[in-house]
């Protein structure tokens, strides 16, 4: 779990690998997921991107990532107490095989271009994804820098 290893004990308790109050550890990660999900939902309104959780926190994703995405998809209540869609898009847990498949599949439709016999493929599903880093920051930066250098040389 990298630099975040100071909290590895909590992860291990939550997974049943260490003696402790497993229910409390799982609840702590659920609460973390809700807070992180709320923060990402607020930030994602400014950005058109997927979210990648990295560092040591990524190692504990099995205990909180579902709660992050659930919170992002939860509606907010308006002044009348009625639910209002929080995000313009649907958030997907990219670490869940079923959700990843749905994210990648989308809702592709073939539509006719008005005034012609031509058709185009269109995917109207607005979506974002939340996943974890597998490369690590140093390697990801190095790969990005290399790709950028190649593009500047005209070799990419």
Where are these regions (language model features)?
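ATP-binding/phosphotransfer module of carbohydrate and carboxylate kinases, centering on a glycine-rich
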Residues: 1-156
